[in-house]
Swiss-Prot record:
Belongs to the IMPDH/GMPR family. SUPFAM superfamilies: CBS-domain pair, Inosine monophosphate dehydrogenase (IMPDH). Pathway: Purine metabolism; XMP biosynthesis via de novo pathway; XMP from IMP: step 1/1. The active site is at C350 (thioimidate intermediate), R446 (proton acceptor). This is Inosine-5'-monophosphate dehydrogenase. InterPro entries: Aldolase_TIM, CBS_dom, CBS_dom_sf, IMP_DH, IMP_DH/GMP_Rdtase_CS, IMP_DH_GMPRt. GO terms for molecular function: IMP dehydrogenase activity; metal ion binding; nucleotide binding. Homotetramer. It catalyses: IMP + NAD(+) + H2O = XMP + NADH + H(+). Its cofactor is K(+).
Length: 539
């Protein structure tokens, strides 16, 4: 094996095909080669290329420690999701109907990651979920929701719930400020048909004219002891809004993932050819679209990506997938994808590999995609197979820029899955988008079975439960803490250095057993390790 190969034998004394061989992954980005023996072909050589190189996944490798002067708390874990979107932590929540809606997306964006709202919703409902995220935190709200004084208070109550706001500026038809209406004004009203003009606050409105910095706004709000500062021009027309809640949020979450207007970033999934959904989401400020398919290396996905990117008026970043080969990544990049999502079948709830016989072990898939993606400076997202924080470190060391999380986030308080009490323990429902329930609800197009009646669907996923883990903030801290620790062991200060410099060693099945706690009965679980995950037992 040449010096350019990704893996190398440690010693010439070990037989080449021995299962005891230890193989080191050399410098990024060359592909894995293990010299897996291939069947002999006939005189025409028709079988010569039937079996490719041996593939590996997360449990098959470990990162080698190196001399380090890096302290884990000092590393920079920010990374590119696309060329225009940089995350402060390299975590993205999966567009699954038991993982990501607005609550999950808000919580993750506050921590510095990004959530992708699933598409098993109507266009209107998915758009509303995106709007909830965009309106949950702002610097200066340039286009706040407003109502007219003649409208009914019932319309105000409905808008507050839908937009997740506690107060609404009231303006005349020409945008002249007339007053403000808050939830407190509606609390004891019995007549829902009463006009807003009879309830709203008209006098002593706290306003500011012209450009106002957030520091100036905070001073005004503190002095006046109010929660909202209305921004107006010289003609008293409403130009924006600043809230004390948003100022407090920016102080509490300084690493939040925000757009140039100070709003939290959010993504949304769409199906192939779903341009109506794409247009609606883009119109409401979504930051990135994910063309979501089980087989991203297909004509319909490629055409969808190309069509969206050629529409210059949309000007939106597009993530496309899923793929598991260099060829798949190359074709999506050629179509205009701003990031490529890698992973076919590694997810805990996915049965694609056993039902269809298709897939590539995840580390090998990442390495293959990165080999071509890096030439175009296109980030790779590792999607699936992440069971521990160490797998995040391995995925990035293999060349991914970020990882997409499903099962680990499904058990969090912010996920939309329902709570389940089973044998005295609390769980949350979790299902694959290829499960029968999810496909019936709307995800059948992801598996190229759109329009198929329920009795004829061929599922590629299962439904189950995962242990309840509490709030995302605590859990994300542990995941990122594991990544920081790994970077400290390897001696890399940034995600880019980890991708470039880390080296792997291939391990045996005995080593995998040795990796986990052994020869002990665990009496107190750690917040970042569950023996249930290792054993595959969900309770």
């Amino acid at each position: 094996m040449g010096a350019s190969t990704r893996f190398r034998r440690q010693s010439g004394k070990v037989p080449y095909n021995s299962t005891a061989a230890s193989v080191i992954i050399a410098r990024f980005p060359h592909r894995i080669t293990f010299g897996c023996p291939r069947p002999r072909g006939n005189e025409n050589g028709m079988f010569d290329d039937k079996i490719g190189d041996l593939g590996v996944t997360f449990d098959d490798v470990l990162l080698q420690p190196r001399y380090s002067e890096v302290v884990p708390s000092e590393v920079d874990v920010s990374s590119q999701m696309t060329q225009r979107i940089r995350l402060q932590i390299p975590l993205i929540s999966s567009p699954m109907d038991t993982v990501t809606e607005s609550e999950m997306a808000i919580a993750l964006a506050k921590e510095g990651g990004l959530g992708i709202v699933h598409k098993n919703l109507s266009v209107r409902r998915q758009t509303e979920e995106v709007l909830k995220v965009k309106r949950s935190a702002n610097g200066i709200i340039v286009n706040p929701v407003t109502l007219n004084p003649a409208q009914k208070v019932s319309a105000a109550a409905e808008l507050m719930d839908r937009a997740n706001v506690s107060g609404i500026p009231i303006v005349e038809d020409d945008r002249t400020l007339a007053g403000i209406l808050t939830r407190r004004d509606l609390r004891f009203l019995e007549d829902p048909d009463m006009p807003i003009s009879q309830v709203m606050t008209r006098e002593n409105l706290v306003t500011a004219v012209g450009n106002v910095t957030l520091a100036q706004a905070e001073k005004i709000l503190t002095e006046k002891r109010v929660e909202k500062l209305l921004l107006i021009d010289e003609e008293r027309k409403l130009t924006g809004l600043i809230t004390i809640r948003d100022i407090d949020m920016m102080k509490r979450y300084p690493r939040a993932c925000k757009d140039p207007q100070g709003r939290l970033r959010v993504g949304a999934a769409i199906g192939v050819g779903d341009y109506e959904r794409a247009e609606s989401l883009i119109g409401k400020g979504v930051d990135v679209l994910v063309v979501d398919s089980a087989h991203g290396h297909s004509r319909n996905v490629i055409e969808t990506v190309r069509e969206i990117k050629q529409n210059k008026s949309w000007d939106i970043d597009v993530v496309a997938g899923n793929v598991a080969t260099a060829e798949g990544a190359a074709d999506l990049i050629a179509a205009g994808a701003d990031a490529v999502k890698v992973g076919i079948g590694p997810g805990s709830i996915c049965t694609t590999r056993v039902i269809s016989g298709i897939g590539v072990p995840q580390v090998t898939a990442i390495l293959s995609a990165v080999k071509v993606a890096q030439e175009k400076n296109i980030p790779v997202i590792a999607d699936g197979g992440i069971r521990f924080s160490g797998d995040i470190t391995k995925a990035i060391a293999a060349g991914a820029s970020t990882v997409m999380i499903g099962s680990l986030f499904a058990g969090l308080a912010e996920s939309p899955g329902k709570m389940i009490l089973y044998q005295g323990r609390t769980f949350k429902a979790y299902r694959g988008m290829g499960s029968m329930g999810a496909m019936v609800k709307g995800s059948s197009d992801r598996y190229r079975q759109k329009g198929t009646e329920a009795g004829k669907l061929v599922p590629e996923g299962v439904e189950g439960r995962v242990p309840f883990k509490g709030p995302l903030s605590d859990y994300a801290y542990q995941l990122v803490g594991g990544l920081r620790a790994g970077m400290g062991y390897v001696g890399t200060r940034t995600i880019e250095e980890l991708r470039r410099d880390a080296k792997f060693i291939r391990v045996s099945a005995a080593t995998v057993r040795e990796n986990h706690p052994h020869d002990i009965a665990i009496t107190q679980e750690a917040p970042n390790y569950s023996p249930d995950v290792h054993s595959g037992d969900a309770g």
